[in-house]
Amino acid sequence: MGNNVVVLGTQWGDEGKGKIVDLLTERAKYVVRYQGGHNAGHTLVINGEKTVLHLIPSGILRENVTSIIGNGVVLSPAALMKEMKGLEDRGIPVRERLLLSEACPLILDYHVALDNAREKARGAKAIGTTGRGIGPAYEDKVARRGLRVGDLFDKATFAVKLKEVMEYHNFQLVNFYKVEAVDYQKVLDDVMAIADILTSMVVDVSDLLDQARKRGDFVMFEGAQGTLLDIDHGTYPYVTSSNTTAGGVATGSGLGPRYVDYVLGIIKAYSTRVGAGPFPTELFDDTGEFLCKQGNEYGATTGRRRRTGWLDSVAVRRAVQINSLSGFCLTKLDVLDGLEEVKICVAYRMPDGREVTTTPLAADDWEGIEPIYETMPGWSESTFGVKDRSGLPQAALNYIKRIEELTGVPIDIISTGPDRTETMILRDPFDA
């Protein structure tokens, strides 16, 4: 039996993690976010009602679940308050269900200003960030000048630290990027107005998780973005600024690494990517447009149209290696309904003619890669909302089996629609 279950994306994000976390938290006591920030966009559909979460864990809608934001998350006070208000307006008692690590770095206005100034300065070489200050906040953390939630307990000292760090960043904004400085007093006033709310939710997350482990409580760790956007293992530099992989669970929450019992990789039945960066199987034809429209592939956070393409088993195998995946959850299978044929990338042809079955590590090495496809028959029958494996067309079952063969990982859950009920659980991670 697995008490500590990790749910993470195996591609470039947007795989459908939020729905699966929400579904599996029916048995969980805690749900923990351990990396990223409000650049995530987790969409939940429950009884036809849609909820989009960016910062708060997807367990927040469950009455008996405590949601935790761990130290690996960069926290925007403004974004958190906005999200809390939206949920509280719907009658969800967020403050009774949400806890924070005091070690969470804060995202403040100057981080957002830096993020946008840098993207503008890069011009055609822009990374395609969400412009929400995620990267600059992580930079401050690593440089040991960042302000954290715990600093809000001493407001006078916080004000001094804030002034020092803002002088540093405003110098860059004005003299290098040639944009306006961020107003110190406004930033201070905005944070002080909600400081007591934030500190009232602080808890020692590592100790809480250790006590939960000793009691045998079920804990779900919710990843954001996807493996191929990991700062170390992704398509660098077109990556996010955190460790999106299973290794980030221990460092981003304080759970001992030996205590992760099961890692569930969410894999979309095709591939998508937002923003710039390598994408070998990207489609620019009618099929790519079909996938975009059928899958409603527009970012929950930015609203940007996602790039679409065939499933890339080479890239997914890298995710299998890095995360030591226990099983897959296959999502958006229904989006492929109606296609005469479906393709899976099984290898890459390099510019020098070599065929390889592993992904390059450097972004420049992705240049000129051609995907080598295996083509399979599609299916005309609808898989939307199917809740039993026996109700799937044979061609869809063959597609599922081939994914398992190419990756060496079993598909334990199949999602056939956005609602939490439109799911087949073949093996429950908490029982694995």
From Swiss-Prot:
What Gene3D superfamilies does this protein map onto?
Answer: Adenylosuccinate Synthetase, subunit A, domain 1, Adenylosuccinate Synthetase, subunit A, domain 2, Adenylosuccinate Synthetase, subunit A, domain 3
Subunit structure, as described in the record: Homodimer.
Look up the EC number in the record and give it: 6.3.4.4
Q: Which residues bind IMP?
A: D14, E15, G16, K17, N39, A40, G41, H42, T130, R144, Q225, T240, R304
* Residues that coordinate or bind GTP: 13-19, 41-43, 306, 332-334, 415-417
Supply the source organism's classification. Bacteria, Pseudomonadati, Pseudomonadota, Gammaproteobacteria, Enterobacterales
Active site at which residues? D14 (proton acceptor), H42 (proton donor)
State how the cofactor is bound: Binds 1 Mg(2+) ion per subunit.
Q: Spell out the Pfam families in the cross-references.
A: Adenylsucc_synt
Origin organism is: Citrobacter koseri (strain ATCC BAA-895 / CDC 4225-83 / SGSC4696)
- Which residues does UniProt call coiled coil? none
| Gene Ontology biological process terms in this record | 'de novo' AMP biosynthetic process; IMP metabolic process
Which SUPFAM superfamilies does this entry report, sorted A to Z? P-loop containing nucleoside triphosphate hydrolases (SSF52540)
GO MF terms listed in the record are: adenylosuccinate synthase activity; GTP binding; magnesium ion binding
Q: What residues does substrate bind to?
A: A300, T301, T302, G303, R304, R305, R306
Is Metal-binding one of the keywords? yes
Q: Which GO terms describe its cellular component?
A: cytoplasm
Catalytic function, reaction form? IMP + L-aspartate + GTP = N(6)-(1,2-dicarboxyethyl)-AMP + GDP + phosphate + 2 H(+)
- Where does it primarily localize? cytoplasm
Query: What protein name does the entry list?
Result: Adenylosuccinate synthetase
| UniProt pathway | Purine metabolism; AMP biosynthesis via de novo pathway; AMP from IMP: step 1/2
Keywords, sorted A to Z: Cytoplasm, GTP-binding, Ligase, Magnesium, Metal-binding, Nucleotide-binding, Purine biosynthesis
Q: Which family does it belong to?
A: Belongs to the adenylosuccinate synthetase family.
This molecule's function is given as: Plays an important role in the de novo pathway of purine nucleotide biosynthesis. Catalyzes the first committed step in the biosynthesis of AMP from IMP.
Gene that specifies this protein? purA
Q: What class of enzyme is it?
A: ligase
